[in-house]
Amino acid sequence: PDCVTRAISLGTGADYRDVQKMLHINGDEKDCDDLCVECYSHMLDEIGYPKLDGNKKTVSDLCNEHKNDTLLVRIEGHLTCCINGNCYDIWDCTGKTVDVYWLIID
């Protein structure tokens, strides 16, 4: 479950603890589990990050297509972060199929 907080913190540059608090507040407001995709998806949408369909691409495919972007990438049961064409995670999920992803815009 730490993957959600870690990916959002890395992708947005926000402090890890601040992201935890934001997720908790969002979960309370939406009456959902802080770390479930339906819950954090609402938060990212409200912040204004465009949500895009993964179109059955792999994490690696997206990294290669977005070499100058920051992405939050959802695969089944996991959220990861790609920055400037590199996937940053504690395990290699680059071969996994993307469900949806968010383009992080400053």
Model regions and ranges:
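Short, solvent-exposed coil/turn linker segments
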Residues: 15, 58-62, 89
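Charged phosphate-binding loop/patch that engages nucleotide di/tri-phosphates or the phosphate backbone
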Residues: 99-106
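Context-gated lysine
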Residues: 21, 30, 51, 56-57, ...
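Active-site-adjacent substructure of cysteine-protease-like catalytic cores
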Residues: 53-83
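Catalytic Cys-His active-site segments of thiol-dependent hydrolases/isopeptidases
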Residues: 73-99
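Active-site nucleophile-adjacent alpha helix/oxyanion-hole segment immediately C-terminal to the catalytic cysteine
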Residues: 1-48
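Short secondary-structure junctions
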Residues: 45-56, 87-89
